[in-house]
Amino acid sequence: MSQAVEFQILTATGWEDYALLDSGNGLRLEQYGRYRLIRPAAQAMWRPALREEEWQSADAVFQPSGGESGGQWQVRKSSLPDVWQMGYRHLRFQVSIGTSRHVGVFVEQSAQWDWISETVQSASQPLQVLNLFAYTGIATLAASYAGAKVTHVDASKK
């Protein structure tokens, strides 16, 4: 006889600088701070809910060229800077469009950043954190801001 396993589903809440505006036809329309971006989303096989005008207002569109990371950004509006700031709760960080579909923040990870902050703050003694494969470093920011001493390691050349 098998036993039931309990688990908690973490959801990404608390964003003011990010919103998933719409998705469909293999794409997603997202708001990153003041800027709207269109990125591929192969799982979004339905029709978009918003009108075409909303999609046309995007500042940039990522055009994939095959493979997971191949492609380039088509900038539609010259007002889109190379780098801009965003925030999540008390954390501030920079994002940018570059040579991949990613912008330097994985918004779905915000539930983990909250967990990290809460765990560090509620610890009975100061914590030391080793963040391997740290990539953009927002988990490092969360741990450090909460009071941990953090070693940040990533092999990315960015």
PLM regions with names:
Residues 1-5, 52-55:
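Short, compositionally biased leader-like segments
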Residues 2-20:
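Short, Gly/Pro- and small/polar-rich lid/capping loops
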Residues 7-9, 24, 80, 130:
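Generic hydrophobic-segment detector
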Residues 11, 88, 158:
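Short, motif-level signal for alpha-helix interfacial/capping segments enriched in acidic residues
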Residues 14-30, 37-107, 114-117:
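Non-catalytic substrate-recognition/targeting regions of SAM-dependent transferases
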Residues 32-33, 132:
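Single, functionally critical "micro-switch" positions that shape active/binding sites
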Residues 109, 113, 137-140:
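Hydrophobic alpha-helical segments
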Residues 118-158:
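Conserved SAM/SAH cofactor-binding pocket of Class I
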